[in-house]
Every structure is written in C-alpha cells, then in structure tokens.
Amino acid sequence: MPFVMAIDQGTTSSRAILFRSDISIAASAQQEFPQHFPASGWVEHEPEDIWATTIATCRAAMDKAGATAADIAAIGITNQRETVVVWDAVSGQAIHRAIVWQDRRTAEFCTRLKADGLEPMVTAKTGLIIDPYFSGTKVAWLLDNVPGARARAERGELKFGTVDCYLLWRLTGGKVHATDATNASRTLLFNIHDGAWDDELLKLLGVPRSMLPEVKDSSAHFGDSVPELFGGSITIRGIAGDQQAATIGQACFTPGMIKSTYGTGCFALLNTGATPVKSNNKLLTTVAYQLDGKRTYALEGSIFVAGSAVQWLRDGLGVIKHASETGPLADKSDSAQSVYLVPAFVGMGAPYWNPRVRGALFGLTRNTGPAELAHAALESVCYQTFDLWAAMRADWPDADAATTVLRVDGGMTASDWTMQRLADLLDAPVDRPVIQETTALGAAYLAGLSAGVFPEPQKFADNWRLDHRFRPAMSAATRERKLAGWGRAVKGLLATDEGE
C-alpha cells in the first residue's frame, strides 16, 4: 500500500504525516521552532529553522512508519500563507529572516497606499485589501531595507517565495522555483481573474518579475526531491496554502460549503464555485484551489488571534499550565459577569481590518479572576467567528439554503466547551470531523490525486466522516445579549484608534 506524505509547515511548528491510500494516518511527527519579535508588531522566522524542522519531521515520520522513499507515491506541501522568504538565486541563502504573516511592520506603507486611492484597483485585481498581512508589502520592505537587495533583485540575483515555494526550491536542490494558485493569490501581486502575476501590481510595489515563481495547479507535478534527503527521490505533486488545504481536507467542494480552522488564528472559507464573489463586508475573495487549469474561488475571513489567545493565558498571564485546562476553568466563571476580550494583539483582521488597535478587556470587576479571563478568551474566538459567519451570509446570495452548517478543524476544536459555545452563538450546527488533520489531509489529497492514489473529489468527499455535531442550545435572548455586548466591546476598542 503506497503512502502519501504531507508536509504541514505552520507558524509555530513543522509537521509531517504519512497517509495510507485509504486516507488513514500511518505515522506523524512534529517539531516546534522559535518565533522572533525584533520590534513591536514584527514577527520573523529563521528560514533555516523552517527547513531543518521540515526535513527532520519528514524523516521521523518515515522512520515511524518503516517507510522508504520508494514506498511514498508523492509529497504534498501545505504552509503558513503570506509569510515571505527572499533568497540568493545561486546559493539559496536567505537575505533576511522570513517575515511572517502576522507581521505589521508595513502598516504605514499600507496606509499611504490607501490614502493614494489605490485600494479599489488592488482589490479588483486580487480580491484582497491593502494590509500588512499580505506578502507584497513585505517583499517591498525587504527590497528597500536589506542593503543592496533592490539592486540584486533588478539584476535577477534574488528569488522570492512563500514558504511552500522556498521548501520546494530546497527539496529539489534549487531546480524548481514554483508555487500554486492558492499561495499566489495571497501575495497582492496576483490577478485572480487572469490567473497570472500582474504587471501593474508589480510596478506599484516595486517587485521585479524575475523574482517571481511559476504558478501551477494545486495538484500537479512540481518536481522531485533530491535523493540524499530521504534516501531516494520522491515526487512532489501537491501544494496549497494551509487554509485552502483545510478546505480541501474538509471536502468543501460544493459551492456554499464553509469551514473554519482554529490554529494560531482562525480562518473561515466559503466555497463560491467558479465565480469570484465580491464582498461588501470586508471579506477577502481568494482562490480555493485550482485543478486542471480551472480555478474555484472562496470568500475568506481571517482572524489573527484564536489559539494564541489561549497561549497568552498560559505564557503571558500564567493562568493555566496546559491548553486543555481552559475549558474546565471557563466553566467555573461567574455567570453574573460579562467580561469581553477583544484579542487585537496584532491589530484586527476581518471584517474590521485595523492594524493599529491593540487588545483590550471590557467589563472587569473586582471579582474578575482567572475563570472569567479563560471564559472571555474562549468566547472571543466564537464571537470573531460569528462576525465572519454573518459577513459571509450577507455576501453569499444563497446563504439561507447553503451555509447552514460549519465544518471545523484545528487544535482548538478539541475543546468541546468552545465548539458548543460556537454553535450557540452561530445558532447553527458545528461539525467536527473524525480526521482532525484536515490541513495535512488536503495537501496529501492534492498530491495523491495527481499520483493516482486518491479518487476524484466527489468520491473523496463521500469518505468524509463526522465525529460530533454540536447543536445550538442557547436561548435567543441570551445569544442576542451576548452578541450585543461583543459589538459594544469592539466598537469601544475601535474608538481608541486616533485614525478612526
């Protein structure tokens, strides 16, 4: 039975999972790596840490499964999106640490672009807004701030890529410089309607075309790993950004299906089919996947803080020692208190898009303690998801008929408390699948589809299995009261921004 290996390169760790042809998991390995915070709002990774942990976990997973390179039909890569690496085209040496998707250093540059009236043009081409979150302004910053970088780029000496592209380059020994349409669609440089890099956008941000990778289908032959990495060459046949990979792993192939992934942040995607839907509620229009040259689009809402709110409770406040303690602690909170956490630690994502504001707690009393803080942290994830859910239903013309169930995945879905509260606030069922590793599964599926190991999308969807459905149990009056309180808290926070 052949294996398909998924590389899942995330914000805080790298993982590798071997899937069997029946979609069961044979083995997995995970290794964390450090994040660097050189200034307020700046987040960086060492590219060598990304590479070393990726290779180490691949080898560890292969060892656990007793698999050799000959046993693996294909590799699929999924990655933290928007994070950028720029490297020397000959040596492969990065010119700077990777600038991570959470990084806000280009906020002022983005503000200037908006003030110049450029956002409507950018949004029309990319489906995105002008925000430090996306790759384009990060690349521009590197070219303008690393000594000699712009001149080297103009001479064709530098390559740019998102993390998938960087890993592909390294895996193939520098032979392949490519990415897929999902990752390209997150750069602010890619026209999602034409499916190509856009000259007007490249000129706007000052990015030479010679730096850019080839853009391919999400399921395609990308190249072959050099033999010395895994004791033999393995073909690389699938690439997708992490949220699009999770959408595929959740089998959201039908327009109207929606999934939400809970990791460091929270990301909800609604499949809109072959037609890109323009949002009137500050959602993003993005590429869900591209197969056989045909793009499927999605509406996306991006929240920057979800699981990291629990990390803050643990590492910042010392309220808990383990994430699993958060739900039971929240259960002990005083129901008479209404404490709201707006976790804008790095600004606010959809649907508010304010990079300047910072987090705040509302409704504190003398009796507020650890239980109330845990309660507020978990509920903040649910409230933010509600904001995305409401925006998607407003933008999607067939929402009442289609977007009736939310499929969830990611580490936080292990918390029954959080998932039940999510169903209560959405007033909709929340479905947790049997296979929680949906991001890795999506990458594996794309690779296995190209390799002929996995079936066509609809047959794959037929194999999706439900672990638990959380049904809403909160009264309408309580729901409305809680949502109104959240709305006031968000409004109060936004009012602290002098730019508002």
Curated annotation (Swiss-Prot):
GO terms for molecular function: ATP binding; glycerol kinase activity. Pathway: Polyol metabolism; glycerol degradation via glycerol kinase pathway; sn-glycerol 3-phosphate from glycerol: step 1/1. Coiled coil: none annotated. Gene3D superfamilies: 3.30.420.40. Sn-glycerol 3-phosphate binds at residues 11, 81-82, 133, 242. Its EC number is 2.7.1.30. It comes from the Bacteria. It is an enzyme of class 2 (transferase). Inhibited by fructose 1,6-bisphosphate (FBP). Disulfide bonds: none annotated. Glycerol binds at residues 81-82, 133, 242-243. ATP binds at residues 11-13, 264, 307, 311, 411. InterPro entries: ATPase_NBD (IPR043129), Carb_kinase_FGGY (IPR000577), Carb_kinase_FGGY_CS (IPR018483), FGGY_C (IPR018485), FGGY_N (IPR018484), Glycerol_kin (IPR005999). It catalyses: glycerol + ATP = sn-glycerol 3-phosphate + ADP + H(+). ADP binds at residues 11, 15, 264, 307, 411. One of its GO terms (cellular component) is cytosol. Keywords: ATP-binding, Glycerol metabolism, Kinase, Nucleotide-binding, Transferase. GO terms for biological process: glycerol catabolic process; glycerol metabolic process; glycerol-3-phosphate metabolic process. PANTHER family: GLYCEROL KINASE, SUGAR KINASE. Key enzyme in the regulation of glycerol uptake and metabolism. Catalyzes the phosphorylation of glycerol to yield sn-glycerol 3-phosphate. Belongs to the FGGY kinase family. This is Glycerol kinase. It comes from Rhodopseudomonas palustris (strain ATCC BAA-98 / CGA009).
